[in-house]
Amino acid sequence: MDISRAKDILDYWFSKGLYTADFDKWFMKSQDYDEEIKEKFGNLLKEAEQGKGFSWLHTKDSYVAHIILLDQFSRHIYRGSGDSFKNDNGCMLFVELGWEMYKEQLEGYEFMFAFMPYMHTENMAYQKKGEFNFHTHKQLYGNYPLGDK
């Protein structure tokens, strides 16, 4: 996988910046966004599904981009099918491989999306670790990664 595509993912996903939410793109069901993501990143997702993305562990930016690709873009590209969640286990493995290296370097909404697979997993051990990381973020930075609600 071409690691230069990591910048494309981050530029697209965080087009409003790392500290400005884009909840419509991120969390609202939209056929337009789904189709746009599939057109721009569908082939890249297929490569990642073949296990070609582990070189993306080498930088914080490529780490975050690969998580977004597997966790978020899968949900957009495969929306409405069982395949929406087929990359969850591979994504969780990838998150775990880089979490200790990058968790303190994550800025703004990067943390939220690097953290999101812990919320999506059905594995209880990972859920407990995610809960711990969630509360640790509050202690370190004074707020929760998703806001203080």
Per-segment meaning from a language model:
Residues 1-80, 85-149:
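Intrinsically disordered, low-complexity activation-like regions
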